[in-house]
Amino acid sequence: MLNINIENEYSRLKTVILGIADNLGNPPSESDAFDPRSLYHIKNNSYPLEEDLKKEVESFKKKLTKHNVEVLRPNNVNDCNQIFARDLGFVVSNMFFLSNIVPNRQDEIEGIKEILNHLNVGVIKLPEFMHIEGGDIIVHNDKVFIGTYSEEDYPSLITARTNNESIDYLKRIITVSYTHLRAHET
Protein backbone atom coordinates (compact mmCIF):
# COMPACT_ATOMS: atom_id res chain seq x y z
CA MET A 1 0.00 0.00 0.00
CA LEU A 2 1.13 3.53 -0.74
CA ASN A 3 1.12 6.08 2.05
CA ILE A 4 0.27 9.56 0.85
CA ASN A 5 0.61 12.89 2.61
CA ILE A 6 1.07 16.30 1.03
CA GLU A 7 1.40 19.29 3.32
CA ASN A 8 2.93 21.64 0.75
CA GLU A 9 4.36 21.78 -2.76
CA TYR A 10 8.00 22.29 -1.81
CA SER A 11 8.91 19.67 0.80
CA ARG A 12 11.02 16.72 -0.27
CA LEU A 13 9.18 14.74 -2.92
CA LYS A 14 9.10 11.03 -2.11
CA THR A 15 6.69 9.56 -4.66
CA VAL A 16 5.10 10.97 -7.80
CA ILE A 17 2.88 9.84 -10.66
CA LEU A 18 4.71 10.87 -13.81
CA GLY A 19 2.86 10.85 -17.12
CA ILE A 20 3.88 8.80 -20.13
CA ALA A 21 4.22 9.63 -23.82
CA ASP A 22 3.45 6.20 -25.27
CA ASN A 23 0.88 5.65 -28.02
CA LEU A 24 -0.43 9.21 -28.07
CA GLY A 25 -2.29 8.67 -31.30
CA ASN A 26 -2.44 11.29 -34.02
CA PRO A 27 -2.07 14.95 -33.13
CA PRO A 28 -5.49 16.45 -32.39
CA SER A 29 -7.36 18.43 -35.00
CA GLU A 30 -7.94 22.13 -34.44
CA SER A 31 -11.48 21.43 -33.21
CA ASP A 32 -10.18 18.88 -30.67
CA ALA A 33 -7.52 21.13 -29.14
CA PHE A 34 -7.90 21.38 -25.35
CA ASP A 35 -6.17 24.71 -24.93
CA PRO A 36 -4.89 27.75 -26.86
CA ARG A 37 -1.25 26.62 -26.74
CA SER A 38 -2.06 23.26 -28.34
CA LEU A 39 -4.19 25.00 -30.95
CA TYR A 40 -1.28 27.31 -31.77
CA HIS A 41 1.06 24.36 -32.32
CA ILE A 42 -1.51 22.45 -34.38
CA LYS A 43 -2.01 25.44 -36.67
CA ASN A 44 1.76 25.98 -37.03
CA ASN A 45 2.68 22.31 -37.56
CA SER A 46 4.83 22.43 -34.43
CA TYR A 47 2.80 20.06 -32.26
CA PRO A 48 5.28 17.90 -30.28
CA LEU A 49 6.30 14.55 -31.74
CA GLU A 50 5.79 11.44 -29.62
CA GLU A 51 9.47 10.49 -29.82
CA ASP A 52 10.51 13.94 -28.51
CA LEU A 53 7.98 13.78 -25.69
CA LYS A 54 9.21 10.31 -24.70
CA LYS A 55 12.79 11.59 -24.45
CA GLU A 56 11.69 14.55 -22.33
CA VAL A 57 9.60 12.47 -19.94
CA GLU A 58 12.30 9.81 -19.57
CA SER A 59 14.92 12.48 -18.91
CA PHE A 60 12.69 13.90 -16.17
CA LYS A 61 12.20 10.41 -14.72
CA LYS A 62 15.99 9.94 -14.54
CA LYS A 63 16.35 13.22 -12.65
CA LEU A 64 13.66 12.21 -10.19
CA THR A 65 15.10 8.75 -9.53
CA LYS A 66 18.59 10.25 -9.16
CA HIS A 67 17.13 12.18 -6.22
CA ASN A 68 15.53 9.03 -4.74
CA VAL A 69 11.98 9.85 -5.80
CA GLU A 70 9.80 6.80 -6.41
CA VAL A 71 8.26 7.30 -9.85
CA LEU A 72 4.90 5.67 -10.55
CA ARG A 73 3.69 5.47 -14.14
CA PRO A 74 0.18 5.16 -15.56
CA ASN A 75 -0.70 2.04 -17.50
CA ASN A 76 -0.69 2.80 -21.20
CA VAL A 77 -4.03 3.65 -22.80
CA ASN A 78 -3.71 3.50 -26.59
CA ASP A 79 -4.37 6.67 -28.57
CA CYS A 80 -4.47 8.74 -25.39
CA ASN A 81 -2.26 11.65 -24.36
CA GLN A 82 -1.19 10.76 -20.80
CA ILE A 83 1.52 13.39 -20.37
CA PHE A 84 -0.20 15.57 -17.75
CA ALA A 85 -0.91 13.13 -14.92
CA ARG A 86 -1.03 16.01 -12.41
CA ASP A 87 -4.41 17.11 -13.78
CA LEU A 88 -6.05 13.77 -12.95
CA GLY A 89 -6.03 14.24 -9.22
CA PHE A 90 -4.45 15.91 -6.26
CA VAL A 91 -3.53 15.19 -2.66
CA VAL A 92 -4.26 17.42 0.31
CA SER A 93 -2.90 16.03 3.57
CA ASN A 94 -3.69 12.31 3.33
CA MET A 95 -6.68 12.59 0.98
CA PHE A 96 -6.54 11.83 -2.74
CA PHE A 97 -9.13 13.68 -4.83
CA LEU A 98 -9.89 12.28 -8.28
CA SER A 99 -10.55 15.16 -10.66
CA ASN A 100 -13.60 15.58 -12.83
CA ILE A 101 -11.65 16.44 -15.93
CA VAL A 102 -13.00 17.57 -19.29
CA PRO A 103 -14.80 14.78 -21.20
CA ASN A 104 -12.09 14.65 -23.91
CA ARG A 105 -9.61 13.47 -21.24
CA GLN A 106 -11.68 10.87 -19.37
CA ASP A 107 -9.72 7.95 -20.85
CA GLU A 108 -6.62 9.11 -18.96
CA ILE A 109 -8.23 8.06 -15.65
CA GLU A 110 -8.09 4.42 -16.78
CA GLY A 111 -4.30 4.61 -16.83
CA ILE A 112 -3.98 5.47 -13.12
CA LYS A 113 -6.67 3.17 -11.68
CA GLU A 114 -4.16 0.51 -10.64
CA ILE A 115 -2.12 3.10 -8.75
CA LEU A 116 -5.25 4.42 -7.04
CA ASN A 117 -6.12 0.88 -5.91
CA HIS A 118 -2.81 0.75 -3.99
CA LEU A 119 -3.35 3.91 -1.95
CA ASN A 120 -3.73 3.43 1.79
CA VAL A 121 -6.69 5.83 1.80
CA GLY A 122 -9.92 6.03 -0.10
CA VAL A 123 -10.07 8.01 -3.29
CA ILE A 124 -12.52 10.88 -3.09
CA LYS A 125 -14.46 11.25 -6.34
CA LEU A 126 -16.02 14.67 -6.63
CA PRO A 127 -19.70 14.84 -7.62
CA GLU A 128 -20.16 15.10 -11.38
CA PHE A 129 -21.17 18.78 -11.46
CA MET A 130 -17.98 19.83 -9.68
CA HIS A 131 -15.05 20.39 -11.97
CA ILE A 132 -11.50 20.62 -10.79
CA GLU A 133 -8.09 19.66 -12.11
CA GLY A 134 -5.03 18.90 -10.04
CA GLY A 135 -2.99 21.50 -11.86
CA ASP A 136 -5.29 24.20 -10.43
CA ILE A 137 -4.42 23.30 -6.82
CA ILE A 138 -1.43 24.43 -4.77
CA VAL A 139 -1.08 23.12 -1.21
CA HIS A 140 0.80 25.39 1.20
CA ASN A 141 0.73 23.98 4.75
CA ASP A 142 -2.56 25.17 6.27
CA LYS A 143 -3.69 26.85 3.03
CA VAL A 144 -4.90 25.57 -0.32
CA PHE A 145 -4.72 27.91 -3.30
CA ILE A 146 -7.24 27.15 -6.02
CA GLY A 147 -7.19 28.70 -9.46
CA THR A 148 -10.65 28.99 -10.93
CA TYR A 149 -12.84 30.79 -13.41
CA SER A 150 -16.24 31.99 -12.23
CA GLU A 151 -17.70 34.07 -15.04
CA GLU A 152 -21.09 33.25 -16.58
CA ASP A 153 -19.53 31.81 -19.74
CA TYR A 154 -17.72 29.07 -17.71
CA PRO A 155 -19.69 26.18 -19.29
CA SER A 156 -18.71 27.25 -22.80
CA LEU A 157 -14.95 27.43 -22.13
CA ILE A 158 -12.95 24.21 -22.36
CA THR A 159 -9.95 25.86 -20.68
CA ALA A 160 -12.00 26.85 -17.60
CA ARG A 161 -11.62 23.62 -15.67
CA THR A 162 -12.23 24.44 -12.01
CA ASN A 163 -15.55 25.88 -10.86
CA ASN A 164 -16.84 27.48 -7.64
CA GLU A 165 -18.90 24.43 -6.66
CA SER A 166 -15.72 22.42 -6.25
CA ILE A 167 -14.23 25.08 -3.97
CA ASP A 168 -17.32 25.07 -1.73
CA TYR A 169 -17.16 21.27 -1.56
CA LEU A 170 -13.47 21.22 -0.63
CA LYS A 171 -14.09 23.79 2.12
CA ARG A 172 -16.50 21.34 3.75
CA ILE A 173 -14.10 18.38 3.55
CA ILE A 174 -10.68 19.86 4.24
CA THR A 175 -10.03 21.89 7.37
CA VAL A 176 -7.56 24.38 5.97
CA SER A 177 -7.98 27.92 4.71
CA TYR A 178 -8.49 28.70 1.05
CA THR A 179 -7.46 31.46 -1.27
CA HIS A 180 -9.55 31.87 -4.38
CA LEU A 181 -7.24 33.06 -7.15
CA ARG A 182 -8.77 35.13 -9.94
CA ALA A 183 -7.19 36.20 -13.18
CA HIS A 184 -5.89 39.74 -13.15
CA GLU A 185 -8.17 42.02 -15.11
CA THR A 186 -6.40 44.25 -17.61
Give the predicted meaning of each segment:
Residues 1-182:
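The feature marks the mature, well-folded catalytic cores of soluble enzymes
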